[in-house]
Amino acid sequence: MYQGKAYAMRQHGFARDQTFELVDQGPNSLTLLLTDSEITHEQYPFAFELRVTYTLTNHSLEIKHGVYNPGSEEILFSLGGHPGFHLDGSLNEYFLDFGGDFKVKQHLITGNFYNGATRDLSLNRRFKLSDELFASDAIVVKSPPFQSIGFGKNDGTRLLTLHCKDWSAVGLWTKPGAPFFCIEPLWGWADSLDSDSTLDCKEGIMRLAPLHKQEFEYSLELH
């Protein structure tokens, strides 16, 4: 709901269903652009430009999202990445490395909404994965106290590390039994069951002034 009008969109927003335009391409990079249109205005009331740049550097893939507000009023938005990685075998054969020991809160979900409940979660350098961890849904940690997550196999093989310095939250997700695992940098998150659905009051919403730009970056380092 924004300024008294209801807007409906799918889970995870509308951008993933749109066609981006290739606006720049170099030897090791490319930039894609999405701008607002009549189609996006049916789901999202603001004018915007969203640029996504992918850059290969040595053994890393850098991903930069640039949001620009070309209009005359503040825009409200959330943004997230959804990198997923193929599993060669069962999820039980893999682990995550958070670079240290952290006590965090997992925010619990009912349907597509946070229900206000949390669960204590201990993260470490050898956090073993299993389908049981994701039986109800994703693990979402708000304001992560770490800036990277390593992904490897229990035999000691290090596969990759996702680096992100300024994420608002991170989601860890798979479908039990599926051949993939996702580490999702987030700047904003789903609504709550007790929300009044007003966009201005949505927890975690990002704000951008007219004619301003904000960038969000993360990288995938291969080992």
Segments from the language model and where they lie:
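Short Pro-Gly-centered flexible turn/kink motifs
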Residues: 1-4, 206-222
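Extended, loop-rich substrate-binding clefts of extracytoplasmic carbohydrate-active enzymes
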Residues: 5, 9-58
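Acidic, contiguous internal or C-terminal segments within carbohydrate-active enzymes
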Residues: 36-88
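Beta-strand-rich interaction surfaces with strong enrichment in secreted/lumenal proteins
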Residues: 51-53, 203-208
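Active-site/ligand-binding surface loops and adjacent short beta/alpha elements
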Residues: 84-164
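Glycine-rich active-site loops that engage anionic ligands at enzyme catalytic sites
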Residues: 155-191
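Short, structured beta-strand/loop micro-motifs enriched in basic residues and often containing a Trp
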Residues: 193-201
